[in-house]
Amino acid sequence: MLLRDLVLRRGCCWSSLLLHCALHPLWGFVQVTHGEPQKSCSKVTDSCRHVCQCRPPPPLPPPPPPPPPPRLLSAPAPNSTSCPTEESWWSGLVIIIAVCCASLVFLTVLVIICYKAIKRKPLRKDENGTSVAEYPMSASQSNKGVDVNNAVV
């Protein structure tokens, strides 16, 4: 609020504001370091004795008691001396085998796709500059002669 009033009344007072912000912490530091450390109450004047009283700080209050343990909503299980049942290791083995089989199938399909892509014949350039794949049907169709209806007279 005070800052807004200063800016509105004086227009642009950034230099004085920056000077104030820079010197304010320095002035506080000077005020704090101006006093001398006090060793005991025997060398204290009456004016200082009134301010500091030379008493030790009061003891800290005792810590609060720990919170009670949480209550269980369900009935507690009866204490049994029998050992807990061990989990079967077959389920983990089945999962590992299933993941390995799925990975093997995926890699096999990937190898087949790559093999077919590499084995495919490369494209050749046609007379008009377009790329045409060399498949048996396209090669036989491109070797046909000029049609009689398209002959130029």
Curated annotation (Swiss-Prot):
It is a single-pass type I membrane protein. Residues 59-79 are annotated as: Disordered. GO terms for cellular component: anchoring junction; plasma membrane; synapse. Residues 114-153 are cytoplasmic. Residues 1-35 form the signal peptide. InterPro entries: PRIMA1. It holds the Pfam family PRIMA1. The chain crosses the membrane at residues 93-113. Residues 59-71 have a biased composition (Pro residues). Induction: By RAF1. It comes from the Eukaryota. Glycans are attached at residue 79. It is found in: Cell membrane; Cell junction; Synapse. Keywords: Cell junction, Cell membrane, Disulfide bond, Glycoprotein, Membrane, Neurotransmitter degradation, Signal, Synapse, Transmembrane, Transmembrane helix. Residues 36-92 are extracellular. Residues 56-70 form the PRAD domain. The keyword Coiled coil does not apply. Required to anchor acetylcholinesterase (ACHE) to the basal lamina of the neuromuscular junction and to the membrane of neuronal synapses in brain. Also able to organize ACHE into tetramers. The proline-rich attachment domain (PRAD) binds the AChE catalytic subunits. Interacts with ACHE, probably through disulfide bonds. This is Proline-rich membrane anchor 1. It comes from Homo sapiens (Human).
